[in-house]
Every structure is written in structure tokens, then in C-alpha cells.
Amino acid sequence: EEQNISEDIEFDNLDHLCNHFMIYKKREAIATARVREKENHIFKIERVAVLVEHRNIKVGSLLINEIIKYYNETENKSSIILHSQVAVEKFYKSLNFVSYGENFLEDGILHIAMRHIN
């Protein structure tokens, strides 16, 4: 709802191909993301969301760092990528992601492609 993305885009029939990560607080999901293998062991973090009241207290950082840790320890990955909204690019840069390419529109929102650097 917050991003005003239509359900047709949000429910893309790819969930069954993804690993899903969640952070709970007292049985309430407060953060989530999914990761999908694109090709050649390239994993893309998608659908990152943190409830508004839990932002700016490192929940998002914890979620992304745990995802990176999981793929570093369990998968023969060549790269972890994501499409960051330009508004939060600085957040991902703080977690060792670097931007590449030009800004682009995805679902009507300005994004930049990013890659994690170990």
C-alpha cells in the first residue's frame, strides 16, 4: 500500500522460486525480503519491506546482513544484486553495495541497480 504498487505487479507468480526472509517481533512480521536466483549463481534481493514504526533502528540492516551471510555460507554465489529505490540508495551503500548503470523506472518508482561487494 505504502508504495502504491498494483497487486498485478506485486503478485508476480515468482514467490515459489524465491527464498523468503522475515524478522519477527513478538510474533509480528516487522521486516521481509525475498531472494531469487537469476542466472549463473547471481542472487537478487527483492521486495524488501520494513514496517514504518521499525525503521531507523537497524532492522533493515539486520535483514540484509543476514541475507548476505546466508548466501555467503550456503550458496555457491557469484554475486548478490538488487534494484534500490534511489531514495534509499545510501542505505544500501552503507551495507557495501555499489551502484552501477543509470537510474531507471521500475513500477513507476526511480531505481538504481546495485551489487554487493564482499
Residue spans of the language-model regions?
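Conserved GNAT acetyl-CoA-binding A-motif
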Residues: 64, 71-84
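Conserved beta-strand in the GNAT
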Residues: 22, 28-37, 41-49
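Helix-loop element at the rim of GNAT/NAT acetyltransferase active sites that forms part
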Residues: 1-7
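Conserved acetyl-CoA-binding loop-helix of GNAT-fold acetyltransferases
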Residues: 50, 56-69
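A conserved beta-turn-beta hairpin within the catalytic core of GNAT-like acetyltransferases
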Residues: 37-45, 55, 74-76, 105-111
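Short loop/turn motifs at secondary-structure junctions and domain boundaries
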Residues: 11-16
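Residue-level recognition of the GNAT/N-acetyltransferase active site
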Residues: 51, 85
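Conserved catalytic-core motifs of GNAT/GCN5-like acyltransferases
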Residues: 81-83, 93, 98-113
